[in-house]
UniProtKB/Swiss-Prot annotation:
Family annotation (NCBIfam families): Hfq, PRK00395.1
UniProt-listed PANTHER family: RNA-BINDING PROTEIN HFQ
Sm domain mapped to chain residues: 9-69
Originating organism: Alkaliphilus oremlandii (strain OhILAs) (Clostridium oremlandii (strain OhILAs))
PROSITE patterns named among the record's database cross-references: SM
Name of the encoding gene: hfq
Protein name per its UniProtKB record: RNA-binding protein Hfq
InterPro entries associated with the record: Hfq (IPR005001), LSM_dom_sf (IPR010920), Sm (IPR047575)
Amino acid sequence: MKNNINLQDVFLNQVRKENIGITIFLVNGFQLKGFVRGFDNYTIVLDSDGKQQMIYKHAVSTISPNSPVNFSAALKKIND
């Protein structure tokens, strides 16, 4: 049976583990910059200049990492 891959979780977990800065674009056009400290099905906790913000995913339009995210290692673990 083939595993279902949740690419959103893989992406957020990689930027969290590798401490990659991200820019979150909200649906209202506002931008938030910082580092992912945690996430669940509905929210992302972002650390920005020492302050934590909880962002609801339904308000997110786009997440842009400051450097490339390597999916290959994470996807290999899931597929093994």
